[in-house]
Every structure is written in C-alpha cells, then in structure tokens.
Amino acid sequence: MEKKETKNETEKTNKQDNKNTKSQKKENLNLVNSDKKITELENEISNLKDLYLRKQAEFENFRKRLEKEKDNFVKFANETIMKDVVNFLDNLERAINSSKKSKDFDNLLTGISMIENEILSIFDKKYNLKKFGENGENFDPSRHEAISIEEKEDFKNPEIVEVYQKGYCYNDRILRTAKVKVAQSKN
C-alpha cells in the first residue's frame, strides 16, 4: 500500500511539476512578449521624439524664413516709387544744368512745370496720389485748412480764393490738407 501511495504521490507531484512547468513557460512566454512589446513601444517613442524634434526645427526654420521675407518686403516695399523718384531727380538735374548754361528762366520754368506734371501724372496713375486745392473750389473743412478768411458780397458758399499749400490724398485718404484763403459772404 505504501508503494501505491508513493506512486500516487509521485504522479501527483509529476502532474503538479508539469503544471508548474507549463505555467512557467506561459509566464516566460508572456515576459518575452512583454519585453518585445516594451522594446517596440520604446522604439516608437524614440521615433516620435525624433519626428517631433524634426518638425519643431522645420517650423523654426519656416518662422525664420518668413521673418526674413517680411523684413525684405518692408525694406524694399518702396523700390518702385524710388525708381520713379530717381527719374524725376534726373529730370530736375537736367533742368538745373540747362539753366546754368542758358540763363533763360522762362525755359527753366517750363521745364520745371513739365517735371511737376510728370511727377503728378505718374503718382496719380501708378500710386493713386492726387493733388487738390485749387482757386475756385468750394471750401471743405475735411480737405482744406483755412489760414485766412475774406468776406465778400457775392459768395453763396465759402470758396477758395488763394492756395498757400496744395493738399494731397492717397487712395482717398488725406495725407495733407490744403492750406488756403477762403472768401465767404458777409451775411
């Protein structure tokens, strides 16, 4: 009987050992799988960190490039106007040099008037800069500054009778009001 018991115990122990071994193998397999998963996740984290740093550097480079482009835009925004101004200066220089040679002030006045008309024409067409403030215009306080007022009999509305300084508007915005003398009715 003892033999039978020992045999049964041995079988039980063997079965138990087999169960333990299987359980251990499962645990080992789970550990190996977990280690693989951890390694995969660590690699993925590393890749994502690398991608994040690259995108951050890319964005910083983009921001710097945009800032440089903005600075250049501001720096050279008036380049077209400056080219036109240089042409006007050339014409003025020619008029001055011509007047030194001939002393004909009527021709000098004509030349300077032509240059003024050229400047106003180009600025009007290209840049929408307009001059205003002429004798005979109705006085408009939003566009004209009355430096002096003269009372006369025959005026229905206040009217400009003398212009001290022309006014200018750019795209319908007043840059400078015209400084004028205004005539108005005594009544």
From Swiss-Prot:
Pfam families: GrpE (PF01025). GO terms for biological process: protein folding. The lineage of its organism: Bacteria, Pseudomonadati, Spirochaetota, Spirochaetia, Spirochaetales. One of its GO terms (cellular component) is cytoplasm. PROSITE patterns: GRPE. Homodimer. InterPro entries: GrpE, GrpE_coiled_coil, GrpE_head. Residues 1-30 are annotated as: Disordered. It is found in: Cytoplasm. Disulfide bonds: none annotated. This is Protein GrpE. Participates actively in the response to hyperosmotic and heat shock by preventing the aggregation of stress-denatured proteins, in association with DnaK and GrpE. It is the nucleotide exchange factor for DnaK and may function as a thermosensor. Unfolded proteins bind initially to DnaJ; upon interaction with the DnaJ-bound protein, DnaK hydrolyzes its bound ATP, resulting in the formation of a stable complex. GrpE releases ADP from DnaK; ATP binding to DnaK triggers the release of the substrate protein, thus completing the reaction cycle. Its main location: cytoplasm. Keywords: Chaperone, Cytoplasm, Stress response. GO terms for molecular function: adenyl-nucleotide exchange factor activity; protein homodimerization activity; protein-folding chaperone binding; unfolded protein binding. Belongs to the GrpE family. Coiled coil: none annotated.
